[in-house]
Structure formats: structure tokens, C-alpha cells
């Protein structure tokens, strides 16, 4: 029989030299396989005297256990090294520049609405909202709009039936707010409105902000002062403003507000006036005790003037080349 110490020494050296799991398995077969060195040693026990056979068998089994232990340890070592190499190959290189995530921006119409809300909020005006599908009372009757007014025709208003329609202004919010409370009132009502019109300066849906203040001893001079300050704040410069007499069914007296452009021409930007007594009566407010003023402005129109946009329809076409300019 080959000396066991020599077999173990050779096995130990070959196990340590095995550089892969495949090579290690070849070593295992060489020593523990059917024709392996230690297997042959066991098969040779029959040639020994009975007195030597038992001791030799114990030594051979001990040698097998030693080799199996060495094989197991080397296998664990190789598997760990293989895993570490794989992880190293998959490691993210943090020194590489990352992909830039492009931030979005507020739509220019949203920017304008927020700017308006901020200005009037600092003056104590709350922000109110209401339904976009409105009934005839809140959209027309309570606002002193006569039955034969052009706004009541299909050419200007989207009707569902004679009493339900898409609101043509946010004035209905003013009526609902006054119905649900008691004077004094001080609020603005921004929102989407709908009119049957579409061209370079009109779209079927657009945004309005209407405002109202109702209290005792409210006068036109207060209205003029607030709107002048608002326009100067909005355009971020001192602007020349004029109030031109006009007519609105829900205000008396009424005026349209113009600003003077740099080329000397006047441009209309909003409408306003003192709340008509009939409007106050429609919501149960005594016009002998209370008075008020109201104003309304088209958000897209103000946005066009502020940013120099010529076509209102550009705000709704979702052209990123256009919208990215307002980030």
C-alpha cells in the first residue's frame, strides 16, 4: 500500500493549486473516485492480514475525511472568489456622469393665475371656486342678464339644455359665494370658462379670474386704486392706466381698463364696475346698505401681454419648444 502521508500531501498540494471548480473536481475524482488513490487503498485491504486490516481501514478512512475536508474548504474559497469577481464586474462606476433628469415647469397660464392669486391674497382676498356646468340662474338671471341678451344664444354659449350650460364666465361663483355667506365679501374666482369662439385671439375654453368686494361704503375710487396697483405689480413696472366707460349687465357704472403700450397705443386688459343693485338683490343683500365692485380678466390675454405671445392657441397645443421657454 502506498504510504497514506504521501497521498495526503500530494492531495493537499493539488487541492491548493486547483484554480477553478472544474479543476478541483478533477482532483476529487483522482483521489476519491472509483479508481482514485484512496479508493484503491480501501480495495487493497483484502490482501492484508486480519490483524492489520482493521487498523489500516481506520487510517484510510481518516485520510479520506481529511481530503474531503480540504476539498470542501477549497470549494467554498473558489465559490466566494467567483462571486466577488462577478460582483466586481457588475459594480456601477459612480465616477461616470449620471443621466440628467429634466425638470418640468409650470404652464405659463398657471404662472399667471398664481401671480394673480398671490397679489390679491396679500390684500385679504380669498380664492373661491364653483361648478363648470352652470344653470341659467347663476350664469345669467342672477347677473342681471336679460333673456334677449346675445350671450344666451347658441352662437356664444354651449348649452346642454335650456337650463344647463358650460359656464361662460366665473361670475356664477360670485353668486354662489354670496348665497352661502353674509357680507362683507372679498374674494377672487379663477377658473376655466367656455364660449363658442375659435381664432387667433379666442379659444372655446379659456381661463378667467373674476373678483368681487362687497361691504359698506365701497366706492369706485377703491376699485381704481386696487386695479392700478395690480397691473403695475403684474407687469413689474409703472404702467399708465385708463378707465373707459363701458356696459356690463351686472355692474353700474361699468368700465373697461386699458394700459398704454410702449408704442403709445392703448390696449384693453380687463373689465370692471360697481356691482349692480339687482345682482345684490338676487342673493338677498340690501343694496341700500351694501355696495361693491367687481372685475374680470382673461388669464391668457394677460399672459400673452406679459410674455409677448401673439397667438393664444399656442397655450393649448402642448408644443414643448414653446412651453420650455417658460421654465
Curated annotation (Swiss-Prot):
Its cofactor is Mg(2+). Its EC number is 6.1.1.20. Keywords: Aminoacyl-tRNA synthetase, ATP-binding, Cytoplasm, Ligase, Magnesium, Metal-binding, Nucleotide-binding, Protein biosynthesis. Signal peptide: none annotated. Tetramer of two alpha and two beta subunits. The lineage of its organism: Bacteria, Pseudomonadati, Pseudomonadota, Gammaproteobacteria, Vibrionales. InterPro entries: aa-tRNA-synth_II (IPR006195), aa-tRNA-synth_II/BPL/LPL (IPR045864), Phe-tRNA-synth_IIc_asu (IPR004529), Phe-tRNA_ligase_II_N (IPR004188), Phe_tRNA_ligase_alpha1_bac (IPR022911), Phenylalanyl-tRNA_Synthase (IPR002319), tRNA-bd_arm (IPR010978). It comes from Aliivibrio salmonicida (strain LFI1238) (Vibrio salmonicida (strain LFI1238)). GO terms for biological process: phenylalanyl-tRNA aminoacylation. The keyword Ligase applies. The keyword Manganese does not apply. GO terms for molecular function: ATP binding; magnesium ion binding; phenylalanine-tRNA ligase activity; tRNA binding. One of its GO terms (cellular component) is cytoplasm. It is found in: Cytoplasm. Mg(2+) binds at residue 252. Its main location: cytoplasm. Belongs to the class-II aminoacyl-tRNA synthetase family. Phe-tRNA synthetase alpha subunit type 1 subfamily. CDD domains: PheRS_alpha_core (cd00496). It catalyses: tRNA(Phe) + L-phenylalanine + ATP = L-phenylalanyl-tRNA(Phe) + AMP + diphosphate + H(+). This is Phenylalanine--tRNA ligase alpha subunit. NCBIfam families: pheS. The gene is pheS.
